[in-house]
Amino acid sequence: MKRTKSIRHASFRKNWSARHLTPVALAVATVFMLAGCEKSDETVSLYQNADDCSAANPGKSAECTTAYNNALKEAERTAPKYATREDCVAEFGEGQCQQAPAQAGMAPENQAQAQQSSGSFWMPLMAGYMMGRLMGGGAGFAQQPLFSSKNPASPAYGKYTDATGKNYGAAQPGRTMTVPKTAMAPKPATTTTVTRGGFGESVAKQSTMQRGATGTSSRSMGG
């Protein structure tokens, strides 16, 4: 009997320790996770063009112009491409599309589209761009083109979105916001044309995922 009691006491001590130490371990892990999240975020500014950037950053006109021009090049490389002007206008609105030269790897969905495009594709105009410090504390700046639709029927209507369809809120330049550093990473080059409404679907899906992630984070922090 004494041996049995001894075993039970030892088992009780182990279980008690596990139950009471686990919350502490979780708390420590949470602190490290939060610290990691903080380090992975970056403060960026949203501008419509180089003039807006220069006005907000006196003495940085050259940097603003360079970032703007780089964003334009990135937009040409990564923006959604459409085989026809009509498809692009249906997504982004009248006066919001421009012809873009065919890029290596671009492939219309069928021969009719290839003939209609005559070697060129259509893409939305760059509505603005995000600008932030380069990773590693360099003296330069990172930039990311932003697009916006003026078609009320589009999920991208009145919003700033990147080439992947991720939503960054109202299309109002001059704002500053915090984004993950991954938001400033180069996006994949566009290699195929998008069907009419396809980009809007991507925006809608991304918005749903963002809302879900925000809700999960709020519930976790609230316990």
UniProtKB/Swiss-Prot annotation:
Region spans: Disordered: 178-223
Disulphide bridges: none
Polar residues biased stretches: 204-223
Higher taxonomy: Bacteria, Pseudomonadati, Pseudomonadota, Gammaproteobacteria, Enterobacterales
Name by which UniProt lists this protein: UPF0441 protein YgiB
UniProt gene name: ygiB
Family annotation (NCBIfam families): PRK11653.1
Skewed-composition ranges (Low complexity): 178-195
A Pfam family recorded for this sequence: DUF1190
Family designation: Belongs to the UPF0441 family.
Superkingdom assignment: Bacteria
